């Protein structure tokens, strides 16, 4: 017993308690203390509250959070160009992860998003599906012109794109650096016509003009939904890649925001408009709001017009019944407006009467209603 430290301490405590005549409380037993620890552990493992889940979901959708989970995969062939250092330096300062990995297509960049672990249950997928991932393919000017020359020989809309694999599941974009400088360096005489170097097995030497290049750009945009970015330098390409990466980080929050109903459409009062039931109750309130949309119209003036003519159809019919144009323009001018205590009674006035009359009777969409504007 002397060698067992905990046992010796327990016995001495019990002995002192018995000698002093104190009764040991029953909660001193080990079984009771174990029972008290179970609820404490259960409290720590309780499911998070709905408010906590909403906060976690909102935080996970923030652009800075998504940007930290973005992974830009760069093909090693991109690094063979001397200007690629500018691109890699820009990606390094952006805040996302950059990986050098072989891609399905050489000289390409691909964007992926890593889900948070663990991910909140009500957080939508911030990354697009795998078959909708974004890819940027870098092309040399000569490579782009060779593919463009093939497209110029096709009369029907292209079924396949020369630079892209038909089995590719990514949404691709093309980027050509220095195309304009390349074309100018291969200019013939005074026209913008440049020779395309082709292999011996291909067709004979052909030529393509800048106008044909522009037609190819339109063709790719309309029929293949393919964007072609013409960059002057690697610096310009780096700026585009950074802007595109930031846009991808903002996309989840925008998609989630657009998928949610506006609060004022369902629960708001001031912006939800006037509720109209099937039996027509509420139409008078809509008519009152329409009168209030005119410039310099107070609620009391709108009340006077709506009281005299509870619907726009009744007012329009009264305007048609007027025999002269002057009578029509001044139909509402003498309507009394309820005045507050201590103020002089007033009328709607000829200006508002004229504006409402023109609004309901004119067929000229360019007619100016408010002469003072």
From Swiss-Prot:
- Which SMART domains does the UniProt record give? ERCC4
Q: Does the keyword DNA damage apply?
A: yes
Per the annotation, which location comes first and is thus the protein's main one? Answer: nucleus
Q: Which GO terms describe its cellular component?
A: endodeoxyribonuclease complex; Holliday junction resolvase complex; nuclear replication fork
Q: Which Pfam families match?
A: EME1-MUS81_C, ERCC4
Arranged from A to Z, the UniProt key words for this protein are: DNA damage, DNA recombination, DNA repair, Nucleus
Q: Where in the cell is it found?
A: Nucleus
Family (UniProt): Belongs to the EME1/MMS4 family.
PANTHER family in the record? CROSSOVER JUNCTION ENDONUCLEASE EME2-RELATED (PTHR21077:SF6), EME1 PROTEIN (PTHR21077)
Q: What does this protein do?
A: Non-catalytic subunit of the structure-specific, heterodimeric DNA endonuclease MUS81-EME2 which is involved in the maintenance of genome stability. In the complex, EME2 is required for DNA cleavage, participating in DNA recognition and bending. MUS81-EME2 cleaves 3'-flaps and nicked Holliday junctions, and exhibit limited endonuclease activity with 5' flaps and nicked double-stranded DNAs. MUS81-EME2 which is active during the replication of DNA is more specifically involved in replication fork processing.
Protein name stated in the entry: Structure-specific endonuclease subunit EME2
Q: Which organism is it from?
A: Mus musculus (Mouse)
